[in-house]
C-alpha cells in the first residue's frame, strides 16, 4: 500500500517526561521527509549548564525557531516558566500550513496559553490527512475528544511504537 492509499491517521503520543515523545516524532518526520511534505512544530528543551531553562518552538517546514518559554516571573506562566506569546505566531503558522504529515509537539498547557491554539488545533486535525501529536498527560481527555487515538509511550515500548507508526504511515520498505 502506498503513502497516498493510507487512510487518514490521528495519533496522540503521551507518556511521562523523558520517555522520548519528541524524539519519536522527530525521527518519524525525518524519515517521512524523503517521501512526503512534512509540517508542524516541535517544542525542544533549552538547557544551560545542564539545567533546563526553558523551551523553544521550531517550525518543521522552515526551521524557524523562537523562545516559547523561559524560567522567570511574569504572565502568562506555566509552573516556573513564563510563556512568550510572540512564539504563538510560529505555532499558529505551523498548524495552518498544508502538508501530508503534520507533527504537533505538543498539546499541553504552554501551547494553550496561545489565544488561537485550540481553534488552530481543531482546524489542523480536521484538515490534515495524517497527524501525529504529542500530548501532555494532563491533556489526554481533550486529545481524545478531538479525535486522537492515544498511545502511551514508555522507554520499554518506544521501539515497538516507532515501528508500528512507520508501518501505519507506510514508511517501511
Swiss-Prot record:
ATP binds at residues 15-22, 101-108. It catalyses: a ribonucleoside 5'-triphosphate + H2O = a ribonucleoside 5'-diphosphate + phosphate + H(+). InterPro entries: AAA+_ATPase (IPR003593), Nuc-triphosphatase_THEP1 (IPR004948), P-loop_NTPase (IPR027417). GO terms for molecular function: ATP binding; ATP hydrolysis activity. Disulfide bonds: none annotated. Keywords: ATP-binding, Hydrolase, Nucleotide-binding. It comes from the Archaea. The keyword ATP-binding applies. The keyword Nucleotide-binding applies. Its EC number is 3.6.1.15. Signal peptide: none annotated. PANTHER family: CANCER-RELATED NUCLEOSIDE-TRIPHOSPHATASE. Belongs to the THEP1 NTPase family. Has nucleotide phosphatase activity towards ATP, GTP, CTP, TTP and UTP. May hydrolyze nucleoside diphosphates with lower efficiency. This is Nucleoside-triphosphatase THEP1. It comes from Pyrobaculum aerophilum (strain ATCC 51768 / DSM 7523 / JCM 9630 / CIP 104966 / NBRC 100827 / IM2).
Amino acid at each position: 500500500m502506498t503513502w497516498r492509499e493510507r487512510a487518514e491517521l490521528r495519533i496522540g503520543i503521551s507518556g511521562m517526561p523523558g520517555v522520548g515523545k519528541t524524539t519519536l516524532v522527530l525521527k518519524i518526520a525525518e524519515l517521512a521527509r524523503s517521501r512526503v511534505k512534512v509540517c508542524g512544530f516541535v517544542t525542544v528543551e533549552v538547557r544551560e549548564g545542564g539545567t533546563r531553562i526553558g523551551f523553544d518552538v521550531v517550525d518543521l517546514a522552515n526551521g524557524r525557531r523562537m523562545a516559547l518559554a523561559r524560567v522567570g516571573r511574569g504572565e502568562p506562566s506555566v509552573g516556573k516558566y513564563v510563556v512568550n506569546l510572540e512564539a504563538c505566531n510560529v505555532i499558529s503558522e505551523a498548524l495552518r500550513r498544508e502538508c501530508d504529515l503534520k507533527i504537533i509537539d505538543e498539546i499541553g498547557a504552554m501551547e494553550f496559553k496561545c489565544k488561537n491554539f485550540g481553534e488552530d488545533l481543531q482546524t489542523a486535525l480536521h484538515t490534515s490527512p495524517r497527524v501525529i501529536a504529542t500530548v501532555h498527560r494532563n491533556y489526554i481527555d481533550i486529545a481524545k475528544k478531538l479525535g486522537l487515538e492515544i498511545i502511551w509511550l514508555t522507554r520499554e515500548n518506544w521501539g515497538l511504537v516507532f515501528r508500528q507508526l512507520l508501518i501505519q504511515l507506510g514508511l517501511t520498505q
